[in-house]
């Protein structure tokens, strides 16, 4: 369960099998504050344990050269901890790598304004996984964006039954429970 939560927490991502999605613009601006609206992955969620997961907004900053710095706070072992990672820009628009190229992240604009689908695939501890996330500029669920995400999940070969919608939390003070 901890490995699954860590995988979930560390994955910031973008679009299910590039051929299933439109090409992205060269200079898409994903910097700013984003809220996780929904997530789905290729692994079964044990007893839907993530139903009570609370997430805080993530901050994305565009670095020199087009790389992205992603920061967010997660509750790990009962304590709030800040996580940060750098997504390295590739030659392909909307495609990034993380952890020395071991993981690939695609950033795909949703059909709904101010929403993106991040699709992430890679390996952690020799286990391959795929995760898709719907993020938006505000914390409210947008039904049209959720339907777009469900279609993207299906198109990408992930199971729409594995979609879960986390609870939104504005803060998780570092070190707090």
Swiss-Prot record:
Subcellular localization is given as:
Secreted
The answer to keyword Zinc applying to this record is no
What's one GO MF term for it? small molecule binding
> Which InterPro entries does this entry report, sorted A to Z?
Calycin (IPR012674), Lipocalin (IPR002345), Lipocln_cytosolic_FA-bd_dom (IPR000566), von_Ebner_gland (IPR002450)
Which proteins does it associate with, and in what oligomeric form? Homodimer.
Q: Which PANTHER family is this protein grouped with?
A: LIPOCALIN, LIPOCALIN 1-LIKE PROTEIN 1-RELATED
**One biological process GO term for this chain?**
sensory perception of taste
Cystine residue pairs: 80-172
- Cite the source lineage: Eukaryota, Metazoa, Chordata, Craniata, Vertebrata
Signal sequence residues: 1-18
Q: What is this protein called?
A: von Ebner gland protein 2
Q: Which family does it belong to?
A: Belongs to the calycin superfamily. Lipocalin family.
GO CC annotations on file: extracellular space
